[in-house]
Each structure stands twice: as structure tokens, then as C-alpha cells.
């Protein structure tokens, strides 16, 4: 599979809006993502396969750390390694920005994502009780070697 990555821009938002509406039932909306793109501390990438956006991910930089805001893969492209590739790109981006760590929050019941993050060296730091509509969330962190 030949994925291409690029920085997300405003022209990508219409296609991403369709992914958010059909495939992502969480709290991210078109307007939130648009605001994120206008924020200087936010960095978002898109994954394209044959010029179709099949996923995206983003971070917000806080001091010398990054918070992963989201990693989203279109439903009919899941379990193909795209999420893994997006996470690889995010880690490379954080390294290029000379950041010291990456943090994220993940639903306790999202076993696939938790396993992926652990494989990349993320460790659980704590729990946010009932953070996701009554479901606990894990706070995870990965240190970046400089």
C-alpha cells in the first residue's frame, strides 16, 4: 500500500468533514478541526491513498511536549496498517520539532488502540474517570529520544 502524507490544509476539510460525519462518532466536529488548523501550536497530517484521504492525525504542541489530539482512519480502510502509519508520521513530526514527549488519551475499552500505543512505547500514566461519556480514559505517554 502506497500511502502519501501531507500537512492538512483548509482544502482537505470538505473530504475530512465526510469522514467525521460518517465514521467518527466522538466529539470532533468540522468547526473544531477548522479552529485547530488555524492554531499555530497545532499540526495535522492527512494520509492519502490514490488521492483519497483515508485518515488523518494531529497534535497540539505544549512547551516541549505534544498531545495527540486524534488519529482517525476511514471505516472501510481500517485494519490495513494506516493508523500505524499515521502514528509513525506523528512520532517523526514530534521528533523533527525536537519535542521530548508525546501524550494522549484513549478510551479504556479501545483495546486495539491501546495495544498499538504500547507497541510504540507508550506507557499508561493514569486514568481519567468517566472521561468518554461515562467510560474511563487512559492517559499514555511516550518519551522521545533526542
Q: What are the functions of these language-model segments?
A:
Residues 4-76, 87-89, 93, 97, ...:
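Acetyl-CoA-dependent GNAT
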Residues 8, 120, 137-138:
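Non-heme di-metal
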Residues 66, 80, 138:
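Glycine-centered loop/turn positions within well-structured domains
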Residues 100, 107-114, 130-146:
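C-terminal "cap" of GNAT-fold acetyltransferases
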Amino acid at each position: 500500500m502506497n500511502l502519501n502524507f501531507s500537512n492538512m490544509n483548509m482544502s482537505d476539510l470538505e473530504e475530512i468533514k465526510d469522514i467525521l460525519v460518517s465514521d467518527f462518532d466522538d466529539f470532533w466536529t468540522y468547526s473544531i478541526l477548522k479552529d485547530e488548523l488555524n492554531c499555530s501550536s497545532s499540526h495535522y497530517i492527512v494520509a492519502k491513498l490514490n488521492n483519497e484521504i483515508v485518515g488523518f492525525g494531529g497534535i497540539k504542541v505544549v512547551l516541549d511536549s505534544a498531545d495527540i489530539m486524534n488519529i482517525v482512519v476511514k471505516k472501510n480502510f481500517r485494519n490495513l496498517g494506516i493508523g500505524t502509519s499515521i502514528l509513525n508520521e506523528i512520532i517523526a513530526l514530534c521528533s523533527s520539532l525536537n519535542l521530548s514527549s508525546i501524550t494522549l488519551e484513549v478510551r479504556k475499552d479501545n483495546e486495539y488502540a491501546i495495544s498499538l500505543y504500547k507497541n510504540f512505547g507508550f506507557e499508561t500514566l493514569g486514568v481519567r474517570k468517566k472521561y468518554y461519556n461515562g467510560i474511563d480514559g487512559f492517559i499514555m505517554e511516550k518519551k522521545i529520544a533526542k
